[in-house]
């Protein structure tokens, strides 16, 4: 039987049930409830590999759900929260999220939610370069524009964890004066660089520039993916039906 979980993200990011008695239901009971998905104009179904138990699939489902919630919180000032239903099917190892596309996100963008987001900072510009810090050592990221420069170039500010900052600073000291560069890799693709001669900024922030960061959209997407965290399991988009209203996100 398909197990269904209903989550409504409020502005306070509280998880509530559906209906007046929903708060009295246990999690297992919530998964057994049947809900009407016809009230949603969009949905995306993910196939998840590498889960052997319902608990493991549920954990991945929660990560995917959080990514969808983040999309709406960051891309839509008018509707910063998203009412949605999350459905897991352990037999098929799939996760489906039904929602109303009030943020007008495109199908192409929605597929980013399935990306592993394995981020690494490596010495040099080669894929086999020495890893300086890896996934789990990045705390936050945001796109920014250098308005003082003539071309208004975009970059991504990346905040490291305390452990990540310590490791990165030690690695930078060893590179000092050697003219080497640091490259940010995401899912096996080089997306930006960091000048090795620069010190880590206040609060453990480094600025990644160049590479694929050609405009606001590219910088925002990279920052969003860095904030979304790494999913260990292989996740692919099995089906995506998104109602786009005017201009795609």
Go through each PLM region and give its residues.
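A structural signal for conserved, well-ordered secondary-structure elements
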Residues: 13, 18-249
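Sec-dependent bacterial lipoprotein signal peptides
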Residues: 1-16
